[in-house]
């Protein structure tokens, strides 16, 4: 590794200043090459990793505090979907050549706030200089009772398809970032625009649903790459999702956008970055699941059923017209 620039701290000083204060038990203040973590008796560890890259998953001009919250939040969303509670995380940070201490201080502060809110301390990682855009890779470690992890592929024909929160806000927020003068989105009131932009910047992992998913869900995943595409990932093997478009929950801001331009409904149904929980529950269990989720502060909607058959999810409009959405799940390649 090359020497630090005169106006920047070296790697050891950088870690001590910005990341050691975030370290949890077992990390030894980030002074060692590894950390230790022991699950509680009768529990399994659940591990997940996601990377975000400047110019791909976030805008380089985004506030560093928001970038940090997103990097941790998208990983904790995966833990929630598996029914796990967060225990800790590892961080690998690739800094772009033009990084500044001000950016790093904001990033560290955002991580500290998010980690404290979610009860998820830092255990270790790596900090390097990237040859290109900045990247952040987080490995999140969660815990759940042994043998209780909720798989993606457990749905059965007849199960009810459920989703938490609202769908499409983040995709519409991204559309607003990419084309702020776009006809329909530009006509939204500032409050509605702010809601959509915030949902894109700040995913909210639905950790409160984790214990309920273990009890009720036959399958679960988070909606990261778009509702339509993620439904396709969850099905297969003789199962096909049959979705009632009118039952897909949209926020008031998203409804205003769709009312201004009906084509934006497809953006909402296929766009990514929702980080809501998509799950299936056995018939007859949906009412109890929704009631307990509401008591935990998370609204859940029943949007369809698992049918027999193959193919992409079938969306039925209020007029009774069934259709497949052309856009599928987001793919990097």
Regions found by a protein language model. Name each.
Residues 39-41, 45, 52, 87-180, ...:
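Glycine-rich anion-binding loops of enzyme active sites
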Residues 1-20, 63, 95-123, 128-136, ...:
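Glycine-/charge-enriched secondary-structure boundary and capping motifs
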């Amino acid at each position: 590794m090359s020497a630090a620039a005169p106006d920047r701290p070296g790697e050891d000083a950088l870690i001590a200043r910005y990341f050691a204060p975030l370290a949890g038990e077992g990390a030894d203040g980030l002074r060692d090459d590894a950390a230790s973590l022991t699950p509680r008796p009768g529990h399994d560890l659940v591990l997940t990793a996601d990377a975000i890259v400047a110019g791909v998953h976030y805008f380089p001009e985004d506030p560093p505090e928001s970038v940090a919250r997103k990097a941790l939040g998208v990983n904790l969303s995966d833990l929630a979907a598996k029914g796990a509670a967060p225990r800790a995380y590892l961080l690998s940070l690739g800094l772009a050549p033009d990084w500044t201490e001000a950016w790093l201080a904001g990033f560290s502060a955002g991580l500290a706030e998010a980690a404290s809110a979610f009860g998820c301390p830092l255990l270790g990682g790596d900090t390097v200089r990237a040859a290109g855009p900045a990247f952040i890779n987080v490995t999140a470690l969660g815990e759940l009772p042994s043998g209780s992890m909720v798989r993606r592929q457990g749905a059965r024909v007849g199960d009810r398809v459920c989703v938490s929160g609202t769908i499409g806000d983040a995709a519409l927020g991204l559309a607003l970032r990419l084309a702020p003068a776009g006809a329909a989105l530009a006509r939204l009131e500032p409050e509605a625009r702010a809601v959509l932009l915030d949902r894109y910047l700040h995913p909210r992992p639905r950790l409160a649903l984790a214990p309920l998913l273990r009890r009720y869900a036959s399958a679960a995943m988070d909606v990261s790459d778009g509702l339509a595409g993620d439904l396709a990932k969850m099905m297969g093997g003789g199962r096909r999702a049959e979705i009632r478009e009118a039952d897909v929950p949209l926020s008031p801001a998203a409804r205003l956008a769709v009312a201004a331009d009906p084509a934006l409904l497809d953006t909402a149904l296929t766009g990514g970055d929702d980080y809501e929980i998509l799950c299936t529950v056995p018939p007859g269990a949906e009412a109890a699941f929704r009631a307990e989720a509401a008591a935990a502060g998370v609204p859940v909607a029943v949007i369809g059923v698992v049918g027999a058959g193959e193919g992409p999810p079938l969306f039925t409009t209020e007029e009774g017209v069934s259709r497949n959405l052309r856009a599928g799940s987001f793919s990097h390649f």
